[in-house]
């Protein structure tokens, strides 16, 4: 994993990731080696989508 620009955000992002995974029905845990790339990508993609939407709503 690359070095975080804001290390304090790690816990919040982890919580956000688990929330999105739950909503999508993806069984995230401490070990995710048994998940497909599609499953992991759907969680990451949805996270990015929501973060962009949140940012865009702030700048309007």
Curated annotation (Swiss-Prot):
<dbReference type="InterPro" id="IPR038300">
    <property type="entry name" value="SASP_sf_alpha/beta"/>
</dbReference>
<dbReference type="GO" id="GO:0003690">
    <property type="term" value="F:double-stranded DNA binding"/>
</dbReference>
<keyword id="KW-0238">DNA-binding</keyword>
<dbReference type="InterPro" id="IPR050847">
    <property type="entry name" value="SASP_DNA-binding"/>
</dbReference>
<comment type="function">
    <text>SASP are bound to spore DNA. They are double-stranded DNA-binding proteins that cause DNA to change to an a-like conformation. They protect the DNA backbone from chemical and enzymatic cleavage and are thus involved in dormant spore's high resistance to UV light.</text>
</comment>
<dbReference type="GO" id="GO:0006265">
    <property type="term" value="P:DNA topological change"/>
</dbReference>
<dbReference type="GO" id="GO:0030435">
    <property type="term" value="P:sporulation resulting in formation of a cellular spore"/>
</dbReference>
<comment type="similarity">
    <text>Belongs to the alpha/beta-type SASP family.</text>
</comment>
<dbReference type="InterPro" id="IPR001448">
    <property type="entry name" value="SASP_alpha/beta-type"/>
</dbReference>
<dbReference type="Pfam" id="PF00269">
    <property type="entry name" value="SASP"/>
</dbReference>
<keyword id="KW-0749">Sporulation</keyword>
<dbReference type="InterPro" id="IPR018126">
    <property type="entry name" value="SASP_alpha/beta-type_CS"/>
</dbReference>
<protein>
    <recommendedName>
        <fullName>Small, acid-soluble spore protein 1</fullName>
    </recommendedName>
</protein>
<feature type="site" description="Cleavage; by spore protease">
    <location>
        <begin position="19"/>
        <end position="20"/>
    </location>
</feature>
């Amino acid at each position: 994993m690359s070095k975080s620009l804001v290390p304090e955000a790690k816990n919040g992002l982890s919580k956000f990731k688990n929330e999105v995974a739950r909503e999508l029905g993806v069984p995230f845990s401490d070990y995710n080696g048994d998940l497909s790339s599609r499953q992991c990508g759907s969680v990451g993609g949805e996270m990015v989508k929501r973060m962009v939407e949140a940012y865009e709503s702030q700048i309007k």
